[in-house]
Swiss-Prot record:
The record marks F115 as: Required for the recognition of 25-hydroxycholesterol. The keyword Endoplasmic reticulum applies. The chain crosses the membrane at residues 29-51, 71-88, 104-126, 130-148, 154-175, 190-207. Keywords: Cholesterol metabolism, Endoplasmic reticulum, Lipid metabolism, Lipid-binding, Membrane, Oxidation, Phosphoprotein, Steroid metabolism, Sterol metabolism, Thioester bond, Transmembrane, Transmembrane helix, Ubl conjugation. Oxysterol-binding protein that mediates feedback control of cholesterol synthesis by controlling both endoplasmic reticulum to Golgi transport of SCAP and degradation of HMGCR. Acts as a negative regulator of cholesterol biosynthesis by mediating the retention of the SCAP-SREBP complex in the endoplasmic reticulum, thereby blocking the processing of sterol regulatory element-binding proteins (SREBPs) SREBF1/SREBP1 and SREBF2/SREBP2. This is Insulin-induced gene 2 protein. It comes from Rattus norvegicus. PANTHER family: INSULIN-INDUCED GENE 1, INSULIN-INDUCED GENE 2 PROTEIN. It is a multi-pass membrane protein. GO terms for biological process: cellular response to insulin stimulus; cholesterol biosynthetic process; cholesterol metabolic process; cranial suture morphogenesis; inner ear morphogenesis; middle ear morphogenesis; negative regulation of fatty acid biosynthetic process; negative regulation of steroid biosynthetic process.
Length: 225
């Protein structure tokens, strides 16, 4: 090599641990964003279903309802969906119980369809009393968990999410931040916990499936390296 010529410095390669940590953190952010937009979309769709029952804050006009004064509701639902979807696989790893029951996208899509169907039933089907209505929705929600989840952690998180979300919703209503147009507020309270439980199970399944896809991609990259 001639004098005066300097060897160009080679780019330093990151170690496998740093690369893995970086890719995992980026994937978590991506999963969170995907879950957020899924939650926003489902919140808008389910709100349009509930308009048929006239129990939401929004006026009957469909287009106006999406851009009503309660604009913060879909983003809040999206944020909650992201937290729930990231929490489920995290709890599975912490407990050392990876969820392997019906781990394919077709099952997840059926779970979403059943969840929307439960919401549609709460908006369309009339019952003689609120207790009968609550019992039916509870059976449907537990059936959704049994069909698409069957994990103890999933059931426990679903119950916790339903309780916490119901309490927060009632506090918002009592403080005048949010309100329902339905004259029968007992009717609204009869289906809220069941809908929140089913929603938690649904978003948990989506989050688990996204996490499993991430693990497959990372495993394939590690084998290639």
């Amino acid at each position: 090599m001639a004098e005066g010529e300097t060897e160009s410095p080679r780019p330093k390669k990151r170690g496998p641990y740093i690369s893995s940590v970086t890719s995992q953190s980026v994937n978590v952010v991506i999963r969170g964003v995907v879950l957020f937009f899924i939650g926003v979309f489902l919140a808008l769709v389910l709100n349009l279903l509930q308009i048929q029952r006239n129990v939401t804050l929004f006026p009957p006009d469909v287009i106006t309802s999406i851009f009503s004064s309660a604009w913060w509701v879909p983003p809040c639902c999206g944020t909650a969906s992201a937290v729930i979807g990231l929490l489920y696989p995290c709890i599975d790893r912490h407990l050392g119980e990876p969820h392997k029951f019906k781990r394919e996208w077709s099952s997840v899509m059926r779970c979403v369809a059943v969840f929307v169907g439960i919401n549609h039933a709460s908006a369309k089907v009339d019952f003689d009393n609120n207790f009968q209505f609550s019992l039916t929705l509870a059976a449907l929600s537990v059936g959704l968990w049994w069909t698409f989840d069957r994990s103890r952690s999933g059931f426990g998180l679903g119950v916790g999410i339903a309780f916490l979300a119901t309490v927060v919703t009632q506090l918002l209503v009592y403080n005048g931040v949010y309100q329902y147009t339905s004259p029968d507020f007992l009717y609204v309270r009869s289906w809220l916990p069941c809908i929140f439980f089913a929603g938690g199970i649904t978003m948990g399944n989506i989050g688990r499936q996204l996490a499993m896809y991430e693990c497959k991609v990372i495993a394939e990259k590690s084998h290639q390296e």
